[in-house]
């Protein structure tokens, strides 16, 4: 298969084929976004994207809060604060929203850089949905801002929406992502 050749070590200098046994059990656990207003961000990630709040940590001395969100079922999560923290940090693919207190009401605060304008850096996170077109119809009804709709551009059947701080979220489904990427490559 042609796709196997692209992933082979010969075509990817620097790729190690010997996974160190010490890394067994590692997971991609979180990515962090700095946010201006937790009320707006929590509404977006819970109501629009359907995530649950897994854990909130407040650091009074340093004047910031952390909100961990994901798609895990919280009904079986531990209620003990320490156990809940350990449980949260064991979940794969969570989002950590970091709020520095006061930014939500500071007229001088201009927001954070999302990485998609110069100087480019971090690009986006991705969320798999059942049907990208139906999901995007719902997002439009909810007034979500789009960076790209599913029928725009050369890569069809993927979309990019923006959260309240302007971070991009790629939206795709498993029914179309394979052909979408193969046709664009």
Curated annotation (Swiss-Prot):
Its cofactor is Zn(2+). Substrate binds at residues 30, 34, 100, 120, 124, 154-155. GO terms for molecular function: lactoylglutathione lyase activity; metal ion binding; protein domain specific binding. The keyword Secreted does not apply. It comes from the Eukaryota. It catalyses: (R)-S-lactoylglutathione = methylglyoxal + glutathione. Binds 1 zinc ion per subunit. Zn(2+) binds at residues 30, 96, 124, 170. Residues 27-174 form the VOC domain. Pathway: Secondary metabolite metabolism; methylglyoxal degradation; (R)-lactate from methylglyoxal: step 1/2. It is an enzyme of class 4 (lyase). The active site is at 170 (proton donor/acceptor). Gene3D superfamilies: 2,3-Dihydroxybiphenyl 1,2-Dioxygenase, domain 1. Keywords: Lyase, Metal-binding, Zinc. Disulfide bonds: none annotated. Its EC number is 4.4.1.5. The keyword Metal-binding applies. InterPro entries: Glyas_Bleomycin-R_OHBP_Dase (IPR029068), Glyas_Fos-R_dOase_dom (IPR004360), Glyoxalase_1 (IPR004361), Glyoxalase_1_CS (IPR018146), VOC (IPR037523). Belongs to the glyoxalase I family. PANTHER family: LACTOYLGLUTATHIONE LYASE (PTHR10374:SF30), LACTOYLGLUTATHIONE LYASE GLYOXALASE I (PTHR10374). Catalyzes the conversion of hemimercaptal, formed from methylglyoxal and glutathione, to S-lactoylglutathione. This is Lactoylglutathione lyase. It comes from Arabidopsis thaliana (Mouse-ear cress).
């Amino acid at each position: 298969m042609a796709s196997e050749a692209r992933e082979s070590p010969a075509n990817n200098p620097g790729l190690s084929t010997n996974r160190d046994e010490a890394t067994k059990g590692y997971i991609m656990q979180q990515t962090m976004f700095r946010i201006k207003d937790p009320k707006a961000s929590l509404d977006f990630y819970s109501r629009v994207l359907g995530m649950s709040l897994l854990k909130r940590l407040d650091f009074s001395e340093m004047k910031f809060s952390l909100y961990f969100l994901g798609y895990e079922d919280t009904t079986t999560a531990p209620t003990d604060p320490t156990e809940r923290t350990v449980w949260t940090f064991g979940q794969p693919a969570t989002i950590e929203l970091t709020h520095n207190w006061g930014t939500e009401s500071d007229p001088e605060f201009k927001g954070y850089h999302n990485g998609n304008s110069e100087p480019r850096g971090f690009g986006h996170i991705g969320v798999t949905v059942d049907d990208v077109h139906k999901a995007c119809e719902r997002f439009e009804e909810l007034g979500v801002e789009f960076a790209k709709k599913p029928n725009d551009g050369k890569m069809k059947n993927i979309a990019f929406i923006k959260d309240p701080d302007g971070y991009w979220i790629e939206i795709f489904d498993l029914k179309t992502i394979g052909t979408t990427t193969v046709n664009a490559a």
